[in-house]
Amino acid sequence: MSRKCDLTGVGVLYGNNVSHSQRKTRRRFEPNLRSVKFKSDITSGAYRLLVNARCISSVEKAGGFDAYILKADDNVLSSAARAIKKKIIQTKTAKSL
């Protein structure tokens, strides 16, 4: 399982631990990932995604899961999130007809 957010694409970063004597040792900065179930109002379904903690508040700020994922760029979304976005768009166009 990759350590990457499904909605924002945030992944592992690499850097250094620096001691008081300025010795540098390599380390990994891992994202604060959480498994969260988002409810879609358009498709009336619930989707479980692996997202970082900051993304949860971004989804709330955007006005909900549907608004956030429709606004998100396809390049940063995971394949599962892209499939959810496609399903939301299809359902939305079917309801508008």
UniProtKB/Swiss-Prot annotation:
GO terms for cellular component: ribonucleoprotein complex; ribosome. SUPFAM superfamilies: L28p-like (SSF143800). Keywords: Ribonucleoprotein, Ribosomal protein. The keyword Ribonucleoprotein applies. InterPro entries: Ribosomal_bL28, Ribosomal_bL28/bL31-like_sf, Ribosomal_bL28_bact-type, Ribosomal_bL28_sf. The keyword Repeat does not apply. One of its GO terms (molecular function) is structural constituent of ribosome. It holds the Pfam family Ribosomal_L28. GO terms for biological process: translation. PANTHER family: 39S RIBOSOMAL PROTEIN L28, MITOCHONDRIAL, LARGE RIBOSOMAL SUBUNIT PROTEIN BL28M. Belongs to the bacterial ribosomal protein bL28 family. This is Large ribosomal subunit protein bL28.
